[in-house]
Amino acid sequence: MIGKEINLLKKYPKTKRDVNKRREEKTEEHRAIARKYGKDFFDGDRKVGYGGFRYDPKYWTEVVKDISNYYELKSGDKILDVGCGKGFMLYDFFKLNPQFNIYGIDISEYAVNNCIESLKGKLKVGNAVSLPYPDKYFDLVISINTHHNLD
């Protein structure tokens, strides 16, 4: 039996930009730079990536509350974010409950090294194919907007 579909991202703010137009403006050179997932992607020009990837509570705070409530997360639970970037969503889990055990993994060494200070040591460089954790270790595993990176 297939479970019911839920949308736990419904409170994530919608973009006001024309995404299709932005996609058309990017050159193959922009895409090649972006695929390195380094400083240019996270904190460089908007045509290459995020255009300055900074923490803003408007993005994940309410989403994290909904996820936590839906899965009935409690103190001590272990949460993994695969494709965590700089760890902004994990930071909001930490703010919601500092007793959550949070872990993140991302392919970008730059993102992991430039994460929010309180997350230092909780994020690792790695990929979704070979996670450096034992099976069934986590109470919740999240991976949002990462499928395009899988080969």
Positions of the model-derived regions?
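N-terminal auxiliary segments of SAM/dcSAM-dependent transferases
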Residues: 1-33
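Class I SAM-dependent methyltransferase Rossmann-like catalytic core
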Residues: 45-58
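Conserved alpha-helix/loop element of class I SAM-dependent methyltransferases that forms part
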Residues: 57-74
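Conserved class I S-adenosyl-L-methionine
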Residues: 76-85
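Class I SAM-dependent methyltransferase SAM/SAH-binding core
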Residues: 88-130
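Hydrophobic adenine-recognition pocket in adenosine-nucleotide-binding enzymes
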Residues: 146
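A short, conserved alpha-helix within the catalytic core of class I
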Residues: 150-151
